[in-house]
Amino acid sequence: MKKDIHPDYHPVVFKDASTGHQFITRSTATSDRTVEWEDGNEYPLIVVDVTSESHPFWTGAQRVMDTAGRVEKFQRRYGNMTRRKKK
């Protein structure tokens, strides 16, 4: 392999913003924030919105999505339109 062409691949801690669950893995991602891990070492901390701990597919929980606002917006835009008659 050629030297000095690969990105820095190092341990990083990812934290789920909604559940607070943290896990360590290896990544090329970097961050100015750090956290002390269970082994006593400090690692870069990356906060993410969704992980397997909070995603509905993995948890089995369903979230209620606010579709009423979308439907009302659609009705305002296109509700008064009629189909064109065929000639």
From Swiss-Prot:
**One GO CC term of this entry?**
ribosome
GO biological process, alphabetically ordered: translation
A Gene Ontology molecular function term of the record:
structural constituent of ribosome
Query: Ribonucleoprotein as a keyword?
Result: yes
The organism sits in which domain of life? Bacteria
- PROSITE patterns (alphabetical): RIBOSOMAL_L31
Question: What Pfam families does this protein's entry cite?
Answer: Ribosomal_L31
Q: Which InterPro entries does UniProt cross-reference here? A: Ribosomal_bL28/bL31-like_sf, Ribosomal_bL31, Ribosomal_bL31_B, Ribosomal_bL31_sf
Extent of the signal sequence: none
Instruction: State whether keyword Ribosomal protein applies.
Output: yes
Alphabetically ordered keywords of this record: Ribonucleoprotein, Ribosomal protein
Q: Which family does it belong to?
A: Belongs to the bacterial ribosomal protein bL31 family. Type B subfamily.
Reported function: Binds the 23S rRNA.
Q: How does it assemble?
A: Part of the 50S ribosomal subunit.
The name this protein carries in UniProt is Large ribosomal subunit protein bL31B
Task: Give the organism, scientific name.
Answer: Corynebacterium jeikeium (strain K411)
What taxonomic ancestry is recorded?
Bacteria, Bacillati, Actinomycetota, Actinomycetes, Mycobacteriales
